Swiss-Prot record:
Substrate binds at residues 10-12, 178, 218, 239-240. This is Triosephosphate isomerase. Keywords: Cytoplasm, Gluconeogenesis, Glycolysis, Isomerase. The lineage of its organism: Bacteria, Bacillati, Actinomycetota, Actinomycetes, Mycobacteriales. It is found in: Cytoplasm. Transmembrane segments: none annotated. InterPro entries: Aldolase_TIM, TIM_sf, TrioseP_Isoase_bac/euk, Triosephosphate_isomerase, Triosephosphate_isomerase_AS.
Length: 261
């Protein structure tokens, strides 16, 4: 079964709820429904925007989906500032990003924490987008493939094959995020192919063949076509370009195999 590409727009800490509504409307207007047969498109807004996005998506019966940028490892309770998976599920979220390099870097999240978050997401029927990726020093040392596989193993440790089948993996080389530097399509394929081979070891070839592996890091309408043409790159986790409705729609159309809207 061919894997359907996924284009997920990570808005990071940008846009209030009114701006969120305007952007989703723009994407929906710019990307006709026919494209959604060939590509899944998701937006990942800040927590405070999710209810507004939900109302718009459900009210207008839009085909794009949405998710959250993080989730708590806890079910509920005295954890000030935390947001639980059950709350996100109630808001109709499909996806939740876990282990993004900015969370790992600024909030010191390790693989065990990322695993805990992925488990909570799965418990509540959410699809975790598990992020892994190396810094420039690792890339220059030439140990990037093993580094990523180690992160992958740590972030999926103990999950059953059935659980791994419900996960999306995002490979984001840290040196390419927001820097304008993009890993070449061959670089992306090298690591994404290694990720799929490792998934086959962890969960069997059948599961590995169905898990979507995304590339993230300065993805835009100019480079997405070459990236998703790689055999093991099944879409993209898009940052800055996802804040521009027209570009995000164009990017999604390219991932669907065109023509441009």
């Amino acid at each position: 079964m061919a894997r359907k590409p996924l284009i997920a727009g990570n808005w990071k800490m940008n846009l209030n709820h009114l701006e969120a509504i305007a952007l989703v409307q723009k994407i929906a207007f710019a990307l006709p429904e026919k494209y959604f047969e060939k590509v899944d498109v998701a937006v990942i807004p800040p927590f405070v925007d999710i209810r507004s996005v939900q109302t718009l998506v459900e009210g207008d019966k839009l085909l794009l989906t949405y998710g959250a940028q993080d989730v708590s490892v806890h079910e509920s309770g005295a954890y000030t500032g935390e947001i639980s998976a059950s709350m996100l599920a109630k808001l109709g979220c499909t996806f939740v990003v876990v282990g993004h390099s900015e969370r790992r870097q600024y909030h010191h999240e390790d693989d065990a924490t990322v695993l805990g978050k992925a488990k909570k997401a799965l418990e509540h029927g959410l699809t975790p987008i598990v992020c892994i990726g190396e810094g420039l020093n690792v890339r220059e040392a030439g140990t990037h493939v093993e580094y990523n596989l180690e992160q992958l193993r740590g972030s999926l440790k103990g999950l059953s094959a059935e659980q791994i089948a419900k996960v999306v993996i995002a490979y984001e080389p840290v040196w390419a995020i927001g820097t304008g530097k993009v890993a070449s399509a061959a670089d992306a394929q090298e690591v994404c192919g290694a990720i799929r081979a490792e998934l086959a070891e962890l969960a069997g070839p059948e599961v590995a063949a169905q898990v979507r592996v995304l590339y993230g890091g300065s993805v835009n309408a100019k480079n997405v076509g070459e990236l998703v043409a790689q055999p093991d790159v099944d879409g993209a986790l898009v940052g800055g370009a996802s804040l521009k409705g027209d570009e995000f729609a164009t990017l999604s159309a390219i991932a669907a195999g065109g023509p441009l809207p």
